[in-house]
Design a protein with these regions (language model features):
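N-terminal positively charged helical leader segments and presequences
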Residues: 1-28
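RNA substrate-binding interface of SAM-dependent RNA methyltransferases
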Residues: 27-112
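Short, glycine/serine-rich, charged loops/turns that create anion-binding
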Residues: 42, 69, 120, 140, ...
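A short acidic, often aromatic-flanked loop/helix-cap motif at beta-alpha or helix-coil junctions
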Residues: 105-111, 121-124, 164-166
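Structured adenosyl-cofactor binding patch, chiefly the S-adenosyl-L-methionine
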Residues: 145-183
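Short, solvent-exposed amphipathic alpha-helical segments in soluble enzyme
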Residues: 53-57, 129-131, 150-153, 174-175
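Glycine- and other small-residue-rich loops at beta-strand/loop junctions that grip anionic moieties
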Residues: 39-40, 140, 163, 167
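Active-site/ligand-binding-proximal alpha/beta "capping" segment
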Residues: 113-148, 155-160
Length: 183
């Protein structure tokens, strides 16, 4: 999770431990430097899905925040631990060596902020995106008009699809578009 890959040889095995000697240590720069997902809180199963797929696609920071219409339940310690286990599994799956962070508040980002907006026709995200970037995605029930106005002042209103997407689908498709533009 710190951009290092170690090769090791097992030197001893006991009933409860294995001891290793590191024989090679290599550093790998992250392929994506800053891709932030600011997602209104979701139900736990959907949150886990977004964390798994977002990690595989290159999200560097997850910010799950309260909105007026989002799931207001704060995850338990066990649920947070499960999210970290999901991240580790996703890192192994995609070969990433940099561990994304999780925060439970809105980010203080001010560069390349893209707000997934359903209120009217907007520019498609793939036409205007660049990294570093922050993608703001709403909850299952959407944002209130006050929240929409606030986010429109922060950044660019964009469309992710000509269709109305589920919150987790919007997050994943937006991240995929941003990550693809980083290549």
């Amino acid at each position: 999770g710190l951009n290092y890959l170690a090769e090791a040889v097992i030197t001893e095995i006991t009933s409860s431990n294995a001891f290793v000697e590191i024989v090679n240590l290599s550093f790998q720069n992250p392929k994506i430097t800053s891709l932030i997902l600011a997602q209104a809180k979701l139900k736990q199963a959907n949150l886990e899905y977004v964390v798994q797929k977002g990690t595989e696609l290159g999200v560097t920071h997850f910010h799950f925040f309260k909105s007026k219409l989002s799931c207001q339940k704060t995850p338990s310690k066990n649920q947070i631990l499960r999210l970290h286990c999901i991240i580790i599994s996703a890192l192994k799956q995609c070969g990433r060596l940099d561990m994304p962070t999780i925060s439970w508040e809105f980010p203080n980002s001010n560069k390349n902020i893209f707000f997934a907006d359903l209120s009217q026709k907007k520019v498609m995200l793939n036409k205007c995106s660049m990294l570093p970037a922050t993608l703001i995605v709403g909850p299952e029930k959407g944002f209130t008009s006050e929240e929409i106005q606030r986010f429109q002042k922060l950044g660019h209103s964009v469309s992710l699809s000509p269709h109305i997407l589920r919150a987790e689908t919007a997050a994943i498709s937006g991240i995929a578009i941003l990550a693809n533009n980083a290549l």
